[in-house]
């Protein structure tokens, strides 16, 4: 226990150091979100573009579904560690691309300039702000890579998540119009960023651990996760098409500006309203008596992995749900013919089945369905 407390205090101290070093995002001209079910947005011109970026340093460390969550490590309760988990739309602070492990820890503890957590919205259900931010960042990252190599055959290799993650880009003739090439790059980037998020949900369920020894099964297929990722992809798509990607600081400021606007458009609840919604689904969607390390703290999951989706809504609130989607094509280009997200076998697959060659997004529904069947069986056995 003394060791765990020491680790906690060390992380806290280093997080404060990081906050002192965080750069302020540049001011941005506010951009209105385009929160319609389908989007046909296009760039007016080929805006100035930043150089190819390094990928974000992992994902932000958030959020298990629920509030006032208690933790344990190696079966030992951590009384000094608790997660409030509720945020409000107008108090989300800044946005920082390429968040470090320490930055994520600071945000999770509530001491960062960038806030993460969950809130409830009338049209989008529960929204996980960390997932919104992560997929927005990955959309920018992929855009910076794709636009620089558009039309070329090449392979982008990412860090492993159980499987070896690779994106194979195929050779093709890009549009002659520079603005159309820009738009095509954005559409493809948003598509791939969402696919990356969907794989992360699958990997978590099958045993992926970003910190060795700490199971992430409690977060796998959380009801709000992929809708939040989809929202992040759509917001980033809008911003990049509006020319907000000439630098990381410009994009970060633009995300900080557009996020509260989008959440209010979705009908964001205040802190007490979100808390009330959590309480209404306690015992149905989550178990407030369980600690974070327990998989079935989460009782309700959403195993759908497609990027055309409704939010999972509690009780009789489905009528107000807003469907969001990403484009399947642009002009005559089918996006799935331009790039393929591939998951190759490794020697550290945990519980993930070994593919004949590699998994693709076409296999995601099958892998998710297997997870759902096993969870349903386990929940029945637990009753």
For every predicted segment, state its role.
Residues 21-218, 237-383:
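Bulky hydrophobic segments
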Residues 201, 225, 231:
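Divalent metal-coordination and catalytic microenvironments
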Residues 228, 232, 236-238:
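Alpha-helical segment that forms one wall of the substrate-binding/catalytic cleft
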Residues 7-17:
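Bacterial N-terminal signal peptides
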